Swiss-Prot record:
PANTHER family: DNA-DIRECTED RNA POLYMERASE SUBUNIT OMEGA. Keywords: DNA-directed RNA polymerase, Nucleotidyltransferase, Transcription, Transferase. Residues 70-90 are annotated as: Disordered. The lineage of its organism: Bacteria, Pseudomonadati, Pseudomonadota, Gammaproteobacteria, Vibrionales. It comes from Vibrio cholerae serotype O1 (strain ATCC 39315 / El Tor Inaba N16961). This is DNA-directed RNA polymerase subunit omega. Promotes RNA polymerase assembly. Latches the N- and C-terminal regions of the beta' subunit thereby facilitating its interaction with the beta and alpha subunits.
Length: 90
């Protein structure tokens, strides 16, 4: 198990409160959203993996926001294509 120094992760995010929010959000993505870890898992829990990703500079609030916007746009485009297909088949 890799040792995570929270202080290093705090320095990447800015403050410990935002760190908790970003790490929890990323851990939730990995646990329930099917998102793959960006660092080796090494039998760590999603929260530890999230902290390691933050510490290595791979995940920030901006990165999470951009990914969610992109996924939302892709989902909306797929829904629009499905509706369009239904309308053309009538």
């Amino acid at each position: 198990m890799a040792r995570v120094t929270v202080q290093d992760a705090v320095e990447k995010i800015g403050n410990r409160f935002d760190l908790v929010l970003v790490a929890a959000r990323r851990a939730r993505q990995m646990q329930s959203g099917g998102k793959d870890a960006l660092v080796p898992e090494e039998n760590d829990k999603p929260t530890v993996i999230a902290l390691r990703e933050i510490e290595e500079g791979l995940i920030t609030k901006d990165v999470l926001d951009a990914r969610e916007r992109q996924e939302q746009q892709e989902q909306e485009a797929a829904e629009l294509a499905a509706v369009s297909s239904i309308m053309h088949n009538r």
